[in-house]
Amino acid sequence: MKKNTHPEYNKVLFVDSSTGYKFVCGSTYQSDKTEVYEGQEYPVCYVSVSSSSHPFFTGSKRLVDAEGRVDKFLKRYSNAKPAQPVQAPAEEGPVVKGKKKAPAKKKK
């Protein structure tokens, strides 16, 4: 088996950028930035959403805007015109189709 094919698994400090909540978890994430947490120095990874800020875990009803996706949607469709009703074509009378003929039999 080849050696050094997998990245190193170390403890990493994850910081929720919206609440400041910090927790240490094992990961293969590598970073040049480090922070001291509970007396030890860890590589740090900043996350935008964690269990301390996500509405599912906090029970709040606020909307999580993922990098402006909601604003982008509203901007795109707020100026859209409402759909026009489709008008049925005027009926001139019943349309009669001709009878289909059975396919001719092939001779052997």
Curated annotation (Swiss-Prot):
Disulfide bonds: none
Compositionally biased residues, Basic residues: 97-108
Gene Ontology annotations for the cellular component aspect, listed alphabetically: ribonucleoprotein complex; ribosome
GO BP of this protein: translation
Molecular function per GO: structural constituent of ribosome
HAMAP family assigned: Ribosomal_bL31_2
Family that this chain belongs to: Belongs to the bacterial ribosomal protein bL31 family. Type B subfamily.
Record-given protein name: Large ribosomal subunit protein bL31B
Lineage: Bacteria, Pseudomonadati, Chlamydiota, Chlamydiia, Chlamydiales
Gene that produces this protein: rpmE2
